[in-house]
A protein has these predicted regions:
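Short, structured segments at the rim of ligand-binding sites
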Residues: 1-190
Length: 190
């Protein structure tokens, strides 16, 4: 909706049952109309920049989506009116945006309420010739536990030891359980 006028959205399985509020309300308030409130629907209109305000305990994906759209729509501030769920994933989004030339100002009050992210007017993504996408700690955790249970070592490649992904904590769980965790660059063996 930030770069084109009409978008058809469909979903299968359990996806149509996922909550889309407060995202739909905020998009409606910023120039987008929907043929209905659940998929399948057609989004019409271009998303406009401005101040977005949503509860943070429904989905961090709403915040990531608006952050990624913000450079295309102008100055935008996105504020969470409740503590932000899965904030590590929003941090991953803002770090990736920084890697591609967009600095996001993050304001975190002491209460974790009214946490705000601002993308300045005129910000734009820059292309990169090479970029390594770090591995997914959620998926890696399953295999690390399997290695611990079977006693058969496994090496998982492309992992960032210092990732902001919450599931990286599995490393400490493995160590606390007595497993050997050995790093070699971006590869981890359990």
């Amino acid at each position: 909706a930030s770069i084109c006028n009409d978008v058809d959205v469909d979903a299968k399985g359990r996806l149509p049952d996922r909550p889309l509020e407060p995202m739909l309300s905020e998009m409606k308030a910023h120039g987008v109309t929907f043929s209905q409130d659940k998929p399948p629907f057609t989004m019409t209109g271009r998303l406009q920049g401005g101040n977005f305000s949503m509860v943070g305990d429904v989905s961090s994906q709403f915040f990531s989506g608006l952050l990624l759209a913000a450079p295309q729509i102008g100055l935008s501030t996105i504020t969470s009116t409740t503590p932000l769920q899965s904030s590590d994933y929003v941090t991953l989004t803002t770090e990736t945006m920084r890697d591609f030339g967009v600095e996001v100002e993050h304001t975190l009050p002491d209460t974790n309420i009214n946490e705000a992210f601002t993308v300045p007017f005129g910000a734009s993504f820059i292309g990169r010739d090479n970029y390594q996408i770090e591995g997914d700690w959620s998926n890696a955790a399953i295999w690390m536990v399997a290695a611990a249970m079977t006693g058969k070592p496994i090496t998982i490649t492309g992992m960032n030891k210092n990732s902001v992904q919450a599931d990286r904590r599995i490393m400490q769980v493995m160590i606390d359980a007595g497993c050997d965790v050995v790093w070699d660059g971006m590869n981890v063996t359990v």
